[in-house]
Amino acid sequence: MLKLLPEPKRAVENRGYTTSFRNIGIGLEALPSPEKQEYLEIARMRFWNRKELGIVPEGGSEGCIEATIIPSLANIEADGGDLFLKQGYYLNVDRDTIVLKYQNKAGFINAITTLKQLLKKNGDGFALPLCEITDWPTVEHRAVAPTFSWYAGYGRIGFDMQLWGYDEWLEYLNVCIDNKINQMNMVMYGYWPFELEEYPETVFRDVPIKIWNKENGRWLTVRYTHPNIEDHFLADFIAMAHKFDFSIFAYVGLNSYNGAYSIKHPEKRMVKPAGSGFMNDFDSVCLSDGENTNYILASMRKISELGFDGFTLEESEEGFWFCNCDRCNERWGRVSSSPVEAKHKANLWLLNLIYKEVRSVNSKAVIGIRAYRQPPLEKDPAFLRECVESMPKDIALFWAPALYVPPTEFKKWIAAFGKERIWGRDTEANAITSTMGRLFRVFESNMIRYRDEPNVQVIERDIEQHITSAQEGVSGINGFMFEWYGLFMFQWAHGNYGWGSKMDRDEFTRLSCEIAFGKELGKRVLVVLKSILTIHESQMPFYTMPFPFQKNKLTVADIPEIQQARLRHPVLLEEIHAIQREIEADPDLAQYIQHFARIENAERRNAVIYEMALASLRYECAVSLEEKERHLDEILHYNEMDFDLVKEMFFDINPVSETGMKSCMYPYHEIKRIIHNMRHPENPDTAVICSGIEALGWLWL
């Protein structure tokens, strides 16, 4: 069997391998002259992680296997229709020659990528398995959604890929293309990671942050600026992506966390209902204020001018209330049956304004929305028809239902909007992991009592949605990749199942690890990834601040499973260390060094969190005040140990509060506040620290 992902549509493996070679000669005689150098350069760049292999003009060097490039798929039988012609390819690898056929540039890129993936080391050279492949995607637009900035200034400053510069983004682009992904929907929430001259206060520049100085054992206040503001690399990155027929979309708010405008101008926020307990009034601005809409339109115009190919506009997740100012009540509130309906109507009005503004800059820009995600999750067909009639006919949907509803709900949306307008679903498991303070969550097995967990988003659910999306023939998939290090399995799943594979999940995870790490090491890596048990600190019973992304509260019935994880930990950690040593010794695996550093840190934290969780359960069972106090001391001790490991590795670890509400993705600070209040009710600290402001819109779960 060919070890190849994404899984090709048709592949025949013939016995044996090519002769050994150190170079591939790219025969471009059949191409028009202007394309020859471009395609040769594309081929060279596609071998970004195979530098020791030369990509040369045909016949250009010794030890060379010749690849004849034919820009035509005529007489190649395939049932892929237009997608075969747009992005498909044909490869025939014989003992001494390669034939590569394609119709369009994307097909050439996909074919060269497959060729690279098939390479086997052979002494001081390489060989390819003898094979014939005819391949094409089932889904045209295969996107991932990474984070360029995420709630910056609102809930955090930045972590993981949000701290990258050009070189890291270029490597990630290459990883995407290796997985035959052809689009990024780059999240930009909070302070803008680009210059907006009309509104400089909204730009991600000189934001104060306290960082841990291990040398002196104290906090230092520094001012942080987004890497793209420092180096202005975004235009070059978009241009590089376009060389590979790769689209870059802006994933921004539809009146939701647009720049730092509602931070710097709190008077522009929506007006909460009088006397309500709602905490998040900083998400959106009042749409009856002309200055606010002017700001939003100026932001969208600027993003269009930066060269993005399209927009993913996300509607606010706050669906329980809507602006209560007199003008918003008059325009939308009084003609709606609920706050969420008023929000939809106001946002559709804004969407039409944005549509015109963006198209005035780029008439070809794709404009899509992520909307209608709040209860009721099963929509009335009449409501969907009204939505269709209220927006331009070419608006794409980057969210369509899947979870928490019966399968018929997806078909209902397809019937209402048309499959060509659906570009994404609820494949957000990686985004859920990214809320958890750098802990590890990929599989069902990483969670305690998964079957009881209200939030079901794990890689298994993402795969199911990709498979059914491909079966229904929708236009696109959108796999969330809000966090990269340690979470590579999500990327592989988005690539494989977005391409149209129906492979068994267990076979996919086994094969993907074997391809990446080799047969023996791959087995060990997969065992580690599936054996990690992650308890989020908020699952301790005394923790009162809602955290909807891992909601099960621990009980004494969970003690045996926690004890098993405790016993497993030393062996698991040593295996992680052994894997790290092998990766560090192999230049071909160097790209995984940071991934396993993150996994190692998460597993060391897990061991501490197990002890803290058990102490919290002892506290719940304690009868005497003395016992309770002793267990609270234990919890605080382990809380400090957990945070010491956080400080050891991560940058953005303290609450941010510019909005007027404190937020931090690490529960450490809120644990201290809660225990202080338990011990000192006469002097309470009332400034709650939410575990990421993204949690506030999910409290319905």
Question: Model-flagged regions — what are they?
Answer:
Residues 261, 265-267, 314-328, 590, ...:
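Active-site-proximal, well-structured secondary-structure segments within enzyme catalytic domains
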Residues 20-51:
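Short, charged N-terminal beta->alpha structural module
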Residues 1-22, 29-33, 60-61, 301, ...:
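Substrate-binding groove of N-acetylhexosamine-processing glycoside hydrolases
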Residues 150, 190-192, 252-256, 317-319, ...:
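Active-site-proximal loop/turn and secondary-structure-junction residues that shape catalytic pockets
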Residues 2-16, 25, 33-35, 78-309, ...:
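Feature activates predominantly on carbohydrate-active enzymes
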Residues 285-289, 315-357:
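Active-site cleft segment of glycoside hydrolase catalytic domains centered on the general acid/base Glu
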Residues 25-26, 54-83, 101:
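Short, well-ordered secondary-structure micro-motifs within conserved domains or adaptor modules
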